[in-house]
Amino acid sequence: MASYLQVENISKSYGDRTLFSNISFNINEGDKIALVAPNGTGKSSLLKILAGVEHSDRGGEVKFMKDIRVAFLDQMTPFNPEHTVFEEVYSRMSDLSPALVEYEQAVASGDSKRLERAIAAMDASDGWSIEQNIRQVLTSLKIERMEQRMGELSGGEAKRVAIACMMLQNAEFLIMDEPTNHLDIDIIEYLEGYLQRSRCTLLMVTH
């Protein structure tokens, strides 16, 4: 199997406390790895360095195989409280068709002429299949009101939207920090099934 990730000599400290120092490892294509350690030992910091959110204290290198897509699910994913669920999903997926966002906004506006133009744009692009895929993933995660604002969601609902965004990226490498926090057992079982079936490479932190 090809090496998807090479990590060399990364370190992280907070004040006088060293979380980890000069650690190196490889993760190969198809690996599914769970990192289990006590709280406060640097698990989340490690994942954030790998995802490019934080930096190693003393240099080192994090190198992913060229051209693979990497998706990161943070333990507490920030979101825009004014976004609808759909707008939040779209804002995290730069490769989606803009026609789809315009269509959803046209439907909400009740403007028939705007809707007519939006439908034509959807027909001319891949908008319908993208919309169907988004709705299917959100429904599987029990999120059905795409017009609901993110600020109105519970912690568990917001986490499910973040998971949907991750799934819709179709990334080859997933980095997940405590993915089951705030989730009901049926959603946890759905996520476990998805990860088992997926051919993605996985590194996650869990209890």
PLM regions and their residue ranges:
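ABC ATP-binding cassette signature C-motif
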Residues: M1-H207
